[in-house]
Each structure stands twice: as C-alpha cells, then as structure tokens.
Amino acid sequence: PAFTAENTANDPDAAKAVYVADVVLDKPGPWNVVALVRDNKGEYSAARVAGVKAYADDPVPDKGDKAPRVHTPTLDDVPDVSEIDTRVPPSTMHDEDLADVLGKKPVVLLFATPALCQTRVCGPVVDVAEQVKRDMPGPAYIHMEIYEDNIPDPKKLRDQVRAYKLPTEPWLFVIDCKGVIDTRIEGAFSVSELTAAVERAQKGC
C-alpha cells in the first residue's frame, strides 16, 4: 500500500502482500489450509499456511448484528498517542470515539496492534486502512489497540476487545450509518476489499 509503517517495513516476517480467496467452510471445527501458487513462469508450488477454525456458535458480532457501542480512546484522552497506538509512525485513526459516531455515519473499526501482533498482519492492515481513509474520507476510521498499556498479555485485553469478544487479531468491522455491521473480516484484507466494504456501508446514508 501507499502507506507503509516502519513496523511493517522493518519486520521481515510481516505480510508484504495480500491475496484474497473466498472459501466456504461448511462445518465447524479446525481446517487445514494449503496455498497453491503459480509464479510468473507458470510453475506451481504449494505451502501449508496457518489453519483456521470455524465455530458453530461464533461469539464475535457478525454481519447484520448491531455493533456494540463502546468508547474508543482518542487523542484528546491521552497525553501521548503512543499510549493508544503501537504503529510507527502512529496511525491517523484516533480522532473519533465510536460511542459518539455509531449510528450517525459509517465506521471502519479496526482492532490491530502493529508492534505486538501475533499473526504478523496487523501492521499491513493498518497501512491498508490508512490508504483507504485517504481515498474515501467520509466514514469514521478508528484504530483500536488490543492490550492495556500495550503489554502483550492475554489477561490484559482492553475492554473494547472484550466487548467484541475477539479471540485473535486483527479484526475489521465496517459498520453502516444505522450502527449495523455490514462487513466483518478476521485477519488480513486488501485495499480492494476494504474499498468495496466502505462503498456498501455508505449506501443509504
């Protein structure tokens, strides 16, 4: 993306590109994932990537659900942006409080911790969100960190993360102007995916 944080640029394990495939998981439980890739010479290679788990009863708010109304910290709430953002440089998505804008305008709510991410894609997806924010400035864009005091401890999840019952990171919620979740994505996403999600959320506003 056009916006690449130092976290992403300096992390050799960070995702440098996102490839999208829509797959239907027709029963709950763990699934193994194998990626088959054809290179520019027409040659194929395969690699096993991180598995996924499908839930019979998913606790995370989904498409069509009302988004939980929680306060998200803004620049006005802290003396230093580093308290609410581990990205270098900090993201520009700390101007609006979800509790104030929910149901009034579309919202792009991104839970991610660029410096502390276990999946190595938090930094890249924040970069993607920054690019879409520049190109589509209408919605409220909110970046929410995962851990209290930015200490990577599963016992110190921020209240907002607990309210959304998130088991992993990153998570993206694109919410329409009625406060209803229109798109939910766990993990990595592309500029085109987020752009399409914002376009859908803006319809009818």
Please state what every model-predicted region is.
Residues 81-98:
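A Trp-anchored, charged/polar loop motif used as the substrate-binding/catalytic surface
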Residues 59-63, 73-78, 182-205:
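Thiol-/selenol-based redox modules, centered on thioredoxin-like
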Residues 98-118:
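Short active-site neighborhood of thiol/selenol oxidoreductases, capturing the structured segment around
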Residues 112-119, 146, 183-184:
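Second-shell loop/turn segments in exported
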Residues 1-26, 30-81:
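Contiguous segments within soluble domain cores/interaction surfaces
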Residues 119-135:
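Typically the conserved alpha-helix immediately C-terminal to a functionally engaged Cys/Sec
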Residues 143-169, 173-181, 191, 199-202:
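Thioredoxin-like thiol-disulfide oxidoreductase module
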Residues 104-108, 136-141, 169-170, 177:
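Loop/turn elements at helix/coil->beta-strand transitions in domains of secreted/extracellular proteins
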